[in-house]
Amino acid sequence: MLIDSSQADSVVAWEQFERIFMDMKTGVDLADIRQSEIPDFSGYETIVVLMSDLNPLKDVVIKIGNWVEKGGRVLFALTLQKDTYVSLIEQKLGITDSDYGNVLVDKIYIDDDFMIGGGRSFQIPDAYDSAWEVSVGETAKVYAWTDDEKKVPLIWENSYGKGKFVVDNFGLCEIATRGFFAASYSLLTDVM
């Protein structure tokens, strides 16, 4: 688990994921990039990145892409901010087009194959422009999208080399979205 304690959303997300992993009875190694070195990824099968701003990772973003290509699996659990380092891996994430702005997420449609209770739309109270405006290519499998005319992808996976990226793009990090995060994390495993 990679977090950045200087990013408020990273800290809030860790509070939610700590509970998710406890409920899933899943062990986790936490690396706060502000307090410790980023570990060598070779000893891991999965990495969860709880950062929306990847600039502090610098060239580690490229290392993450190379690690996935060799068979690693990564979940970007927070809506990414378009910047230089994210641009380096956009295509690897399955993104074919992106904007610098975010879009409103007031209703999320969940694919019925993604999780129990899927196949319908969920209203989001206190909605705001929380999702990065992107389009994904045919190689990406989209599991959730905005329930509007734009249908912006909110949860998707994209195989890359021998590995896989999973991206959560809904931008909401609260108790009510733990199920979405847990289901997204399960996409990293071979068995759902």
Language-model-detected regions and their locations in the chain:
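Short, solvent-exposed coil/turn elements at secondary-structure transition points
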Residues: 34-36, 80, 145-148, 171
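A glycine-rich, often tryptophan-bearing local segment used as a flexible ligand/cofactor-contacting loop or short
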Residues: 54-128, 135, 140-141, 145-147, ...
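A general structural signal for short secondary-structure junctions and capping/turn motifs
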Residues: 38, 66, 132-135, 155-159
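A short acidic, often aromatic-flanked loop/helix-cap motif at beta-alpha or helix-coil junctions
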Residues: 35-40, 103-109, 150-151
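Short, surface-exposed linear patches
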Residues: 22-25, 51-53, 69-73, 97-99, ...
